[in-house]
Amino acid sequence: MLSIKDLHVSVEDKAILRGLSLDVRPGEVHAIMGPNGSGKSTLSATLAGREDYEVTGGTVEFKGKDLLALSPEDRAGEGIFMAFQYPVEIPGVSNQFFLQTALNAVRSYRGQETLDRFDFQDLMEEKIALLKMPEDLLTRSVNVGFSGGEKKRNDILQMAVLEPELCILDESDSGLDIDALKVVADGVNSLRDGKRSFIIVTHYQRILDYIKPVYVHVLYQGRIVKSGDFTLVKQLEEQGYGWLTEQQ
């Protein structure tokens, strides 16, 4: 599904990613961990298509297409979803209007018929019930006045509605209490299937106790220096990153 080969990325002429390679197949859940400044958020921003991140080498393919040649909007149309650490607030725009606009943009990109207000309302009722979310979430302005947990619920709702093939969560657990963490984990777990993949970018292991990724990678100085299964998470919890960084 996603194939990253020898990726090099710079920000303001400073090299951040220095030869990162990663393959993600359908249905897999990968965790990207690492100390501060290792390049985790740079990887997320590059996959999302942020213009201020300059790719200086390597390739990124998504479902066989050159991802780096696609605009952020087209990447969303192809099936990539990004949940940011700090979701944007949009005053005056209701969640329902925002989600219908986003979904119909994706459907138009794929050559599918757009949904009218009534069909979309039926879809929303289905998703709200599935995720056990309060209905008033739909009438509120996007993320305005939301608690940390509510913002994460909104991310999960967006994923459920848009049904992306690859979901990237960029430090979505940052600053969250245990209840909000469970909101994120429960949402991710409810959307896991044999086709949808996840990349969980995090500095801490606590959210991974609930999501339990199949693959865990440690990023350091712009490269993946260690990969393993969930036992690597426990090892990092006990020993930190020092034993890995000292080997580099």
Regions found by a protein language model. Name each.
Residues 14-15, 74, 182:
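Short coil-to-beta microelement around the adenine-binding A-loop and adjacent beta1/P-loop entry
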